[in-house]
């Protein structure tokens, strides 16, 4: 199964156009075959381009969200996602918009983009939820418990929607087929459409009573706790797919999937920039002047960093390989440490004399008896 387009770009399903464009530029530069050392860079680059093409086209994105990844790709192979035809590109279809395209989808897949009739097995729908993790979890990888409320097969009627001893009769509206067929004239010719029978909800049979537990739905909502494997290096907004943890299928169809969108909490020390991390670290005036070796924090413990003599406040140093793990790739990003020279708030007598001597040696004339605020007051 190929990767969901939202996951390819690392954006949430409600991402706007600017977010998608920004994510595309970042991914495209990361996987461009001319610069990437990833052996699968060319294929990933193609996936990124395809994801951008679909998600930046309003009609294609609407189809994609409605049909899901696999069914959208199947429709695309059949040529059913050519949105230009819905804009008048096929002669006589101008003004048809999505209505005309949806008619074609229903011909291929049935209502809602499904390839099976109601009387046959139907896969359950995918469910979506969010999971919050902290940056340490995203760095090391973690197994998290997630409690979700989801539809499950009714235990009293085994998903049938009626008691096992309920009387039944063949639906007269569809003659027991569970479907009603109509023929429509379109710009592409006569199109036969098959829809679910509204009288029997596609079952072909009408029962004398419904299950009192699920009220005929065949499903009930229950709370369940799942174990979610969060991989090291995952980014904020990326989605994990849990196979078979979605809504139950119908007529023996497989369950849908659970899509877990990862949200990473802000960190008090580090800011994340892709696979890189950034932080600020204080150093003293003597350390900046003479140079020193200081300990700086990383998500894997403190490490030593050399501060050269003459370092200026705001200068940034790069620690290679001390950033985030690269998801599904080898290695880590880098850590960028911006140093800040801290001015002491108070001095003892010895420190004061030393700084006075330093100022005099440099030819600076500073009234050390009068502080800044005293100078400011006396100027008015």
Swiss-Prot record:
TM segment ranges: none
Naturally occurring in which organism (per UniProt): Natronomonas pharaonis (strain ATCC 35678 / DSM 2160 / CIP 103997 / JCM 8858 / NBRC 14720 / NCIMB 2260 / Gabara) (Halobacterium pharaonis)
CDD domains named among the record's database cross-references: DnaJ, DnaJ_C, DnaJ_zf
Subunit structure: Homodimer.
Listed GO MF terms: ATP binding; heat shock protein binding; unfolded protein binding; zinc ion binding
Annotated localization: Cytoplasm
The name this protein goes by in its record: Chaperone protein DnaJ
Basic and acidic residues bias locations: 27-87
């Amino acid at each position: 199964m190929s990767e969901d387009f939202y996951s390819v770009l690392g954006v949430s399903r409600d991402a706007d156009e600017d977010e998608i464009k920004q994510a595309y530029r970042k991914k495209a530069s990361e996987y461009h075959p001319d610069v990437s050392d990833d052996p699968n860079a060319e294929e990933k680059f193609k996936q990124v381009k395809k994801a951008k093409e679909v998600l930046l086209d309003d009609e294609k994105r609407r189809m994609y969200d409605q049909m899901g990844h696999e069914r959208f790709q199947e429709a695309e192979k059949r040529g059913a996602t050519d949105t230009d035809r819905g804009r008048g590109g096929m002669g006589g279809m101008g003004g048809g918009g999505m209505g005309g395209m949806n008619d074609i989808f229903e011909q291929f897949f049935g209502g809602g983009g499904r390839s099976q009739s109601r009387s046959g097995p139907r896969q359950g729908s995918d469910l979506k939820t969010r999971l919050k993790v902290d940056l340490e979890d995203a760095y090391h990888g973690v197994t998290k418990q997630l409690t979700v409320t989801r539809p499950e097969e009714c235990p009293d009627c085994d998903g049938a929607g009626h008691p096992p001893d309920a009387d039944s009769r063949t639906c007269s509206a569809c003659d027991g087929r569970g479907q009603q067929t109509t023929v429509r004239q379109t710009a592409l010719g006569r199109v036969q459409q098959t829809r679910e029978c509204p009288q029997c909800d596609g079952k072909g049979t009408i029962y004398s009573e419904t299950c009192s537990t699920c009220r005929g739905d065949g499903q009930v909502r229950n709370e369940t706790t799942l174990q979610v494997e969060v991989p090291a290096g995952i980014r904020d907004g990326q989605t994990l797919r849990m196979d078979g943890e979605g809504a139950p299928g119908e007529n023996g169809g497989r369950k849908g999937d659970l899509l877990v969108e990862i949200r990473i909490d802000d960190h008090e020390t580090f800011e994340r920039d892709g696979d890189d991390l950034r932080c600020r670290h204080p150093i003293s005036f003597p350390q900046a002047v003479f140079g020193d070796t200081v300990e700086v924090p990383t998500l894997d413990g403190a490490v030593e960093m050399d501060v050269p003599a003459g370092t200026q406040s705001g200068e940034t140093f790069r620690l290679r390989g001390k950033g985030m793990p690269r998801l599904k790739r080898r290695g880590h990003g880098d850590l960028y440490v911006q140093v800040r020279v801290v001015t002491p708030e108070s001095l003892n007598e010895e420190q004061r004399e030393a700084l006075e001597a330093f100022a005099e040696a440099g030819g600076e004339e500073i009234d050390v008896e009068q502080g800044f605020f005293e100078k400011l007051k006396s100027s008015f």
